[in-house]
A protein has these predicted regions:
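Repeat-solenoid scaffold signature
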Residues: 70-110
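Short loop/turn segments immediately following beta-strands, especially the blade-tip
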Residues: 1-3, 52-60, 117-124
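Structural motif
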Residues: 44-51, 104-113
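Surface loop/turn signatures of beta-propeller and other carbohydrate-active proteins
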Residues: 1-27, 60-84, 127-145
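Structural WD40 beta-propeller signal
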Residues: 27-29, 86-88, 119
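Disordered, acidic Ser/Thr/Pro-rich linker "stalks" and the adjacent N-terminal cap
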Residues: 135-198
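Hydrophobic core segments of beta-strands in well-ordered, beta-rich domains
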Residues: 22-41, 92-100
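A short beta-strand element within beta-rich, extracytoplasmic domains
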Residues: 200-204
């Protein structure tokens, strides 16, 4: 009774004798091999990537301490599973994974990219604190934990519209959810957003 109905098949699948994991990817760092995998549940917000570690590419592997290392359960577009980890030309580590939408199809997804790295204990991590906000990409070495330069200003702010279709109200334009949206009831519709104070706006 504690679980939402849509989560029950996922939990049952995890505790059967035939669970499934997919999306293997391996990186080598400081003599260790990091075997990454996608946890079950691409259609859920908790879709994530885990990692095993070994001194040999053929194992034996040990489950890392900080699993899942790629996990983004909320925000505009949740989910962070079935991905790859790679260095750019400046020596920065990045992790890409798929993020859930599941509106037009159960497995409808998009690709997200986040800063990643290895901590002092050799644990692979992925910084998803502001996981779906813009992140600057430069041609220099950067701190994987630095905050984004741009912040979300519109979340749940006051909004008006010329009209709307039922179920597509103006408030859905600022609810930080990729699966909902405002839709005008006419061809020449408009939307007005009040940020309630003056801001330096960089993107709409």
């Amino acid at each position: 009774d504690m679980l939402p109905k849509e989560m029950i098949p996922l939990v049952k699948g995890m505790f059967t004798e035939k669970p499934f994991i997919e999306g293997p990817w391996m990186d080598k760092y400081n003599g260790k091999y990091y075997l990454q995998y996608a946890c079950p549940g691409a259609e859920y917000n908790v879709y994530a990537d885990g990692v095993y570690v070994s001194g040999s590419p053929l194992g034996p592997f040990t489950l890392a301490e900080n699993n899942p290392y790629s996990y983004h359960a909320g925000g505009f577009m949740p989910g962070a599973g079935h991905g790859s980890t790679m260095w750019d030309l400046s020596g920065n580590l990045w992790h890409t994974s798929t993020m859930r939408i599941s509106v037009n199809h159960q497995f409808e997804r998009r690709v997200g990219i986040w800063r990643a790295g290895f901590d002092a204990d050799g644990e692979l991590f992925c910084n998803q604190r502001y996981g779906d906000w813009p992140v600057a990409v430069s041609e220099k070495k950067t701190d994987a934990w630095e905050n984004p330069q741009w912040y979300l200003l519109s979340y749940k702010k006051s909004v008006e519209a010329s009209s709307y279709e039922k179920g597509k109200e103006p408030a859905l334009a600022v609810d930080e959810d990729a699966t909902t949206w405002w839709q005008s009831g006419t061809k020449d519709g408009w939307l007005k957003l009040d940020l309630q104070k003056e801001y330096d706006v960089r993107a709409i």
